């Protein structure tokens, strides 16, 4: 079966935004106008097609990115809806990895919010070209031009409007298309499915000309030939303008900007046109980096129908009817359902039972999947997020995704004995789906701990245990993931020698322990020369240190950001063994870290609080009491914005306190930023409590 849509007419796009910018509503409207859903799903009444997990319907926020396929003007658009809540940035990060372009949705009133900055940074990191859609133009306080300025100032980007609004708030009726220089006015009777193209209203002609001039100037900068034409006073034609916008959008030197109101069904078709005109096809983005597992050399995988199959698993979901779904972005070649595929990350072969095309929560069986597509594979057992699937003869390992360590842990206890076993299985499944969620057993108490990126993240996990897996669980107090590190350099030797009849044990090492930059992790350097320690024992020393660093000397927390150099030692022909050197390495590390000025580290959260001015003093006083460092204060739409770094341990229960302090008018967002040193008086309390 040949492919229906050629590769250059495919768009893999994500819709990314802050909570409440109207992202899910925008996705819904796209599905409505491209003919996928016959009744528009409203988030307000909990019926949106994209939000298909029960909790999402209740909370009105999007948690898992559903991948949906739709068609517009002979192009196939694969749409990935991404969550806007900060605890789910891992979801955004994974979808960014497999997108070719993105639509960033901003609220015309709220503008650039802290979460939008995070998502914007992630899109920059993966080099994803994007267009901006300013939504909710019908709301009181809507201001398109404010958002344009905020994108320049806060996101340091270059937004170039390609349409501007006609009216605002309740007088918003349509947009002026600056490329065609026409007014587009939507018809309310047809739910926005029809619109009229008219001449530009006389009162807006001046503004339209001014913005058209800005657009043409930005376009001319993209190409020398266009620049000459522009400077020579010649008009650029529509084709040239479109080509220039696309060039600038792909190299990210300009960001095309549009507006509309998804809820009121205005501006969605012009957004779809822009997706097709300006966002890249799979053939127009840079080739994906990978590694040849045989030679460990870097290779590039080009998006094309030619060549052997290669794809990346970017999401795993458990579906109540078909079991585990593995969402895969195909970069090269094609694959038929029922065939075998090689997981080069795990070095295992897997059989693909079925291939499913997802329409948010409806599914369609397909026989074959081609390059550039996004598709759900059924029947894979060992494949996890970030694994590469390919042809065994032409193996390649695509760039791995990096997942953050959890910053918060909560103990979970099953209510009954029957729940105990079910809980283990359920947590395992959830950890497979979400790489930023971890499950572990606390050694001292035997309790099960779950770790994640924030309170909401773990709340939803516990909620899913109850709902999807019917496991009743009690949760304990949240615990913070402290770390330990060292502040000074120390050299130590340790000789481990045991003689008690029969074969003895002998391992002798000299190590140097040095602090490293925050966030740089652990490094082991072997400087043994002349065979004073045989090379087969060196990995044992490293292993001993790695085991010992899981339990720091201060309070038993993992030790991070240090370098160990093994520079001398001795061995015994008969008595030396791997075990002896492992113990020697571990003891030397413990002794060295006691002497290297160990300190306790805690997760510091980047907190942004938005409050009316009259509560400003109370809020700042409260953040100071929580050991916060205030970084900046801004104004946004008549509210005060306080930016601060606050230790996570001080932020538990903050939402309730903020609500009561501001009579429900304050809001806040927080995300993990870095690990900071705990002040000595507080560190002392924590250490005493741990050693209790």
Swiss-Prot record:
Gene Ontology CC annotation, any one: cytoplasm
GO terms classed as biological process: ribosome disassembly
Keyword presence, Phosphoprotein: no
Xref: PROSITE patterns: G_TR_1 (PS00301), G_TR_2 (PS51722)
Keywords noted in UniProt: Cytoplasm, Elongation factor, GTP-binding, Nucleotide-binding, Protein biosynthesis
Compartments, record wording: Cytoplasm
Pfam families: EF-G_D2, EFG_C, EFG_III, EFG_IV, GTP_EFTU
Top-rank taxon: Bacteria
MF (Gene Ontology): GTP binding; GTPase activity; translation elongation factor activity
Binding site for GTP: 17-24, 81-85, 135-138
SMART domains, sorted: EFG_C, EFG_IV
Domain (tr-type G) ranges: 8-283
InterPro entries: EF-G-like_DII, EFG_II, EFG_III, EFG_III/V, EFG_IV, EFG_V, EFG_V-like, G_TR_CS
UniProt family annotation: Belongs to the TRAFAC class translation factor GTPase superfamily. Classic translation factor GTPase family. EF-G/EF-2 subfamily.
PANTHER family in the record: RIBOSOME-RELEASING FACTOR 2, MITOCHONDRIAL, TRANSLATION ELONGATION FACTOR G-RELATED
Function (record text): Catalyzes the GTP-dependent ribosomal translocation step during translation elongation. During this step, the ribosome changes from the pre-translocational (PRE) to the post-translocational (POST) state as the newly formed A-site-bound peptidyl-tRNA and P-site-bound deacylated tRNA move to the P and E sites, respectively. Catalyzes the coordinated movement of the two tRNA molecules, the mRNA and conformational changes in the ribosome.
Protein name: Elongation factor G
Species the sequence originates in: Helicobacter pylori (strain P12)
Gene: fusA
């Amino acid at each position: 079966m040949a492919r229906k849509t050629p590769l250059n007419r495919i768009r893999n796009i994500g819709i990314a935004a802050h909570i409440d910018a109207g992202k899910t509503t925008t996705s819904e409207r796209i599905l409505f106008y491209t003919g996928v859903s016959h009744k528009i799903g409203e988030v307000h009444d909990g019926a949106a097609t994209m939000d298909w997990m029960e909790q999402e319907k209740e909370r009105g926020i999007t948690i898992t990115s559903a991948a949906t396929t739709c068609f517009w003007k002979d192009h196939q658009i694969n749409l990935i809806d991404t969550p806007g809540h900060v605890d789910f940035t891992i979801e955004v990060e994974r979808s960014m990895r497999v997108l070719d372009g993105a639509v960033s949705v901003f609220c015309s009133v709220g503008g650039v919010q802290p979460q939008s900055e995070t998502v914007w940074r992630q899109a920059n990191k993966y080099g994803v070209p994007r267009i901006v859609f300013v939504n909710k133009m019908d709301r009181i306080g809507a201001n398109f031009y404010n958002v344009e300025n905020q994108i320049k100032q806060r996101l340091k980007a270059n937004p170039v409007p390609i349409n501007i609004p006609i009216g605002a708030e309740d007088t918003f009726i349509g947009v002026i298309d600056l490329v065609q220089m026409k007014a587009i006015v939507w018809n309310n009777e047809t739910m926005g499915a029809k619109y009229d193209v008219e001449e530009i209203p006389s009162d807006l002609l001046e503004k339209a000309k001014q913005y058209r001039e800005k657009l043409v100037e930005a376009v001319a900068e993209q190409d020398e030939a266009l620049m000459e034409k522009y400077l020579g006073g010649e008009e650029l034609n529509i084709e040239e303008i479109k080509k220039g916008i696309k060039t600038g959008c792909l190299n990210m030197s300009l960001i095309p900007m549009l507006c509309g109101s998804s809820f009121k069904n205005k501006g969605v078709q012009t957004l779809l046109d822009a997706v097709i005109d300006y966002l890249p096809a799979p053939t127009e983005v840079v080739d994906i980096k990978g590694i040849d597992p045989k030679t460990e050399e870097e290779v590039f995988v080009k998006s094309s129908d030619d060549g052997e199959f290669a794809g990346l698993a970017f999401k795993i979901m458990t579906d109540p009817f078909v079991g585990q779904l593995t969402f895969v972005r195909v970069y090269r070649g094609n694959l038929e359902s029922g065939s075998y595929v090689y997981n080069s990350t795990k070095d295992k072969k897997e059989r693909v039972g079925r291939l499913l095309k997802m329409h948010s929560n409806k599914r369609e069986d397909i026989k074959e999947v081609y390059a550039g597509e996004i598709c759900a594979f059924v029947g894979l057992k060992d494949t996890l997020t970030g694994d590469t699937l390919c042809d065994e003869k032409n193996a390649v390992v695509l760039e791995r995704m990096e997942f953050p360590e959890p910053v918060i842990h909560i103990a979970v206890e099953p209510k009954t004995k029957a729940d105990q076993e079910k809980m283990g299985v359920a947590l395992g499944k959830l950890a497979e789906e979400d790489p930023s969620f971890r499950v572990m057993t606390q050694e001292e108490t035997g309790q099960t701990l779950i770790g994640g990126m924030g309170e909401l993240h773990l709340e939803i996990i516990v909620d899913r245990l109850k709902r999807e897996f019917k496991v009743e669980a009690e949760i304990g107090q949240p615990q913070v993931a402290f770390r330990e590190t060292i502040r000074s350099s120390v050299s130590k030797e340790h000789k481990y020698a045991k003689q008690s009849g029969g074969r003895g044990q002998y391992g002798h090492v000299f190590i140097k322990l040095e602090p490293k930059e925050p966030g740089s992790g652990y490094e082991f350097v072997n400087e043994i020369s002349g065979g004073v320690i045989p090379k087969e024992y060196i990995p044992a020393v490293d292993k001993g240190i790695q085991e010992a660093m899981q339990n720091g000397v201060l309070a038993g927390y993992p030790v991070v950001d240090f370098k160990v150099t093994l520079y001398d030692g001795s061995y015994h022909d008969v008595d030396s063994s791997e075990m002896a050197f492992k113990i020697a390495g571990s003891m030397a590390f413990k002794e060295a870290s006691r002497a290297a000025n160990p300190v306790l580290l805690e997760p510091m959260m980047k907190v942004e609080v938005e409050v009316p001015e009259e509560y400003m003093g109370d809020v700042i006083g409260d953040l100071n009491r929580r050991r916060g460092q205030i970084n900046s204060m801004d104004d946004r739409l008549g509210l005060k914005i306080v930016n601060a770094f606050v230790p996570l341990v001080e932020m538990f229960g903050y939402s309730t306190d903020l609500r009561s302090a501001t009579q429900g008018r304050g809001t806040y967002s927080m995300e993990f930023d870095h690990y900071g040193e705990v002040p000595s008086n507080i560190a002392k309390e924590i250490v005493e409590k741990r050693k209790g």
